[in-house]
């Protein structure tokens, strides 16, 4: 993997450029795609692909992280006229974990209005969808999922496909609206994150992946924190969760959100815990509520809320091998046992939904009782919580709040499908968002692989988003190379699931790369791959010269034993044989008929007398 990485990763991919697809419905909607150019003379058209990297790979845009990214969704909000600016909650020292620190961290200087819904109005994408309104965000994600393909290029989705929620041949804004109205998909997009490029999470769309980042114990600059996010989205992360703890949380998050073109998620409980010096028993609803509003005003797009962990479920974990492995779950379990009462997240869930509704924040209902070992998979505690998450989903939907459900964890292959079936049944088809799952526990250092196996399977079965796992899982904090490895590993899993689901256009990139491989177009092979730099570097290790990029063999087989070169020879031989046989057949026909021109007049019809 790449070792020397610039502070902000802004360069475009090889043979690629950013293009923008204009919406036919909204004049102010232009959807970014990545166009990969292929070798001249190959008779191959350039390929447009889904792109998560934002403006950072656009050569025409100057990146200045002190100013943040363009606020692309502000015109859409202005036209809808159902939001209003208001005085923001003042930043407190404890927001940054600075109770005893006299030196504040650098704050993001560029200020903008803080927005909220007018007069308690529901301004969520679910509310619009249920009202039959197609928003700019819905049109945006439809174009994005199609990779620029338009309705005229493919048949329209059949109405019955929209009704039963299956995958259409082409995505339309109406299909997107229907999926959101049914709760099968969400567009996580806080109105206070106008820099975000809308994306959709749902099982009838591309499988998405999330990358987790967090502040280091020693941070050199805010640029370093922003670059963690930029690095993750460069390699394909569809969303990023900021799991920072300790000091500077508020300011770090502000820098990340202002510079992020993808949705940002958090676990608000982590910051709330910092405000009580890490003592779980001292947490209160008021502190947690204040933290939600703080993050909502900054623009966090989705909250992980561990509201499904209830007091009666805690004893169900006693006989587990690994107990409660969720950090948020263990915090709330400790609080519940100390106070011997239901979680304040469960008891105040209605109010949490009111806050989410005000800013269009999606709720990711956390699996605090997920299994942390394959021995604990699919147990009573896990499914008791899942049932509760289904009940909470209906509470959120009643307030037009978008919801997805978090899932395991550690699950052996033969138990994965049951997880998906239970989730669809108990949680009413809300999108599923899983961590892997890891399919075995014997491979520390390789858990990106053990989990990608489960991720590909559960993505095929219907999971909408996969949370990546890096090689450092269970061992330590991932560095940038680990993040890249984790993201690409999960892009492979997600793409494999898309192929198995029969997603429109999913196989086009595979086919283009396969043709390039068969034609020995080495640079096209590199440029079409998920990681062009590594593919090219591996080829350079044994065939480093520029002339080697033109040869019709690789170092694995050599010139005499290359199967594809032999296949070319076989194909040429067969074509010559067919051509020769055709000429012989024509000659025989000529000799038989004695004429160069063969009579092709239709035979006379027989007349039948009745």
From Swiss-Prot:
GO terms for molecular function: 4 iron, 4 sulfur cluster binding; carbon-carbon lyase activity; zinc ion binding. One of its GO terms (biological process) is thiamine biosynthetic process. InterPro entries: ThiC (IPR037509), ThiC-associated_dom (IPR025747), ThiC/Bza_core_dom (IPR038521), ThiC/BzaA/B (IPR002817). Substrate binds at residues 212, 241, 270, 306, 326-328, 367-370, 406, 433. Residues 83-103 are annotated as: Disordered. Its cofactor is [4Fe-4S] cluster. Its EC number is 4.1.99.17. It catalyses: 5-amino-1-(5-phospho-beta-D-ribosyl)imidazole + S-adenosyl-L-methionine = 4-amino-2-methyl-5-(phosphooxymethyl)pyrimidine + CO + 5'-deoxyadenosine + formate + L-methionine + 3 H(+). This is Phosphomethylpyrimidine synthase.
């Amino acid at each position: 993997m790449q070792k020397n990485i610039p502070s902000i990763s802004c360069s475009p991919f090889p043979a690629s450029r950013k293009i923008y697809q204009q919406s036919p419905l909204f004049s102010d909607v232009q959807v970014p795609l990545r166009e990969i150019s292929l070798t001249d003379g190959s008779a191959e058209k350039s390929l447009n692909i889904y792109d998560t990297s934002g403006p950072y790979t656009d050569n025409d845009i100057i990146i200045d992280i002190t100013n943040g990214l363009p606020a692309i969704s502000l015109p859409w909000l202005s036209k809808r006229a159902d939001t209003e600016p208001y005085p923001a909650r003042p930043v407190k020292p404890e927001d940054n974990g600075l109770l005893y620190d006299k030196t504040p961290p650098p704050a993001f200087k560029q200020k903008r209005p803080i927005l909220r819904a007018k007069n308690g109005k529901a301004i969520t994408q679910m509310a619009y969808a249920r009202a039959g309104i197609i928003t700019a965000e819905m049109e945006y994600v439809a174009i994005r999922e199609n990779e620029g393909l338009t309705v005229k290029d493919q048949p329209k989705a059949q109405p019955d496909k929209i009704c039963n929620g299956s995958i259409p041949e082409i995505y339309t804004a109406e299909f997107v609206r229907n999926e959101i109205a049914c709760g099968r998909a969400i567009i996580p997009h806080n109105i206070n994150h106008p820099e975000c490029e809308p994306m959709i999470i749902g099982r009838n769309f591309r499988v998405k992946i999330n990358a987790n980042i967090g502040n280091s114990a020693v941070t050199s600059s805010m640029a370093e924190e922003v670059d963690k996010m930029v690095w993750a989205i460069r390699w394909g992360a569809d969303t990023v969760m900021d799991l920072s703890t300790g000091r500077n949380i508020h300011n770090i998050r502000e820098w990340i959100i202002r510079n992020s073109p993808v949705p940002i998620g958090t676990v608000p409980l982590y910051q709330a815990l910092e405000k009580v010096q890490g003592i779980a028993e001292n947490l209160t609803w008021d502190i947690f509520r204040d933290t939600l509003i703080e993050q909502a005003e900054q623009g966090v797009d989705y909250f992980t809320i561990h509201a499904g962990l209830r007091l009666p479920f805690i004893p169900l974990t006693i006989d587990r091998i690994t107990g409660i492995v969720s950090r948020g779950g263990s915090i709330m379990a400790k609080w519940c046992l100390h106070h011997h009462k239901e979680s304040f997240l469960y008891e105040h869930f209605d109010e949490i939904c009111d806050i989410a509704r005000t800013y269009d924040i999606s709720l990711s209902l956390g699996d605090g009782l997920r299994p942390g070992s394959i021995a604990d998979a699919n147990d009573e505690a896990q499914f008791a919580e899942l049932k509760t998450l289904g009940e909470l989903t209906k509470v959120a939907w009643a307030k037009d709040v978008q919801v997805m459900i978090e899932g395991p964890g550690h699950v052996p292959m033969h138990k994965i499908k049951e997880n998906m079936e239970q989730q669809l049944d108990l949680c009413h088809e809300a999108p599923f968002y899983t961590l892997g799952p890891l399919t075995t526990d014997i491979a520390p250092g390789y858990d990106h692989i053990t989990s990608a196996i489960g991720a590909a399977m559960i993505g095929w079965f219907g999971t909408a988003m996969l949370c990546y796992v890096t090689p450092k899982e269970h061992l330590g904090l991932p560095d940038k190379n680990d993040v890249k490895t984790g993201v690409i590993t999960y892009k492979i899993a997600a793409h494999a699931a898309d192929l198995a689901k029969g997603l429109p256009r999913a196989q086009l990139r595979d086919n283009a790369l396969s043709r390039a491989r068969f034609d020995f177009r080495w640079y096209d092979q590199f440029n079409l791959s998920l990681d062009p730099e590594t593919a090219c570097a591996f080829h350079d290790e044994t065939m480093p010269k520029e002339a080697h990029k033109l040869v019709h063999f690789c170092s694995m087989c050599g010139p005499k034993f290359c199967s594809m070169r032999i296949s070319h020879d076989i194909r040429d031989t067969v074509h010559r044989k067919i051509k020769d046989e055709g000429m012989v057949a024509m000659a025989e026909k000529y000799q038989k008929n004695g004429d160069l021109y063969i009579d092709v007049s239709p035979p006379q019809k027989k007349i039948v007398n009745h």
